[in-house]
Amino acid sequence: SLITVLLATSYKQIGRLMFLFSLLTLIAILKGFWQKFIGFDAIEYDALMESGMYKTHLLPQITRYFSIFTDAGNYGSNMGFTCVLFGITGLFSKKPGLKTYYLCVSALSLYSMFTTGTRGAIVVPLGGLLLFALISKNIRLMSAATVGGICIYVFFAFTYAGESNYMIRRMRTAFRPNKDASYLVRKQNRQKLAEYLRDKPFGEGLGLGGVEARRFGNRLTTTIPNDSTYVKIWTETGIVGIILYLLIYAGSLLWGCYYIMFKVRNDELRHLLTALACGVFGMMLSAYGNAFFTQFPTGIMMIMFLGILMNGKYIDERLTIEKQQALLTATKKDSTL
């Protein structure tokens, strides 16, 4: 975050970073398509077998693709993030070519999100739409985002349209948790952890949460899978740790949203920061149902984008000065002529 604040100090730098990030996103999408239409390579297949990931990724009715990420949950949520990020960026881009490019990346990201079979990933674009409706300060955009979000929710929660498609059917279970056996098991596991951690305000200890930590010790917290980033942090650092963690991340996001709504004067920068804020908010919501938020590269990316949000006021002031200097230079040239 500190490095981002020190280096990402101009609108042009943020624009270049966004374009570079879109290229990396396309690489991830293409790799996901390769896995879907051609298949896993030998290294990926061996990794699935040796790590036990085949139990959650090679399902009877669907194969969950993970591209270049650690698992399908990480890949799916990141595709939801890039769908929101480049969708909003493309929507407000003034350059026709760049607008088309970003909107295409957004659409490909949305499709890739569905190929992962990650139910919690659908929360990312929905959460992004929700925040967009709140901070856009544009009645038409707020109305469109609200209507769009409601339509998506109604489609998944109250209809059976597209039920023959397994990807849609699997995503639909995220909106009907009480009918989902996986959700009920997670709920029971959290109740067990709550009872166990009642007298441990600082948790069980770093690295001692989740079944992947069995090699470090055999205890209750290493026998229960952490299917949520927040549950994992709560298990390892206790109620004190999770409160501090949420305060830092939520505070940073709220700080950025405050600047977007009331301080940033340049529209092009406001739209870019809005896209980042909406994407990060969606990821934070999705982290409740998936333990991906601290994994590579998601953890680094979220800290980096929050750093840009918190640096928004300085970037805006610098952009204003650059515009004034450009206008002054143009005026001098005109007077000389």
Q: Locations of the language-model features?
A:
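Transmembrane alpha-helices of multi-pass inner-membrane enzymes
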Residues: 275-334
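Transmembrane alpha-helices of multi-pass, membrane-embedded glycan-processing enzymes
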Residues: 9, 18-31, 79, 102, ...
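Hydrophobic transmembrane alpha-helices and their immediate junctions
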Residues: 96, 100-101, 109, 130-133, ...
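Long extracytoplasmic/lumenal interhelical loops at the membrane interface
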Residues: 53-55, 59, 162-164, 172-237, ...
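Alpha-helical transmembrane segments of multi-pass inner-membrane proteins
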Residues: 15-47, 53-61, 66-135, 257-258, ...
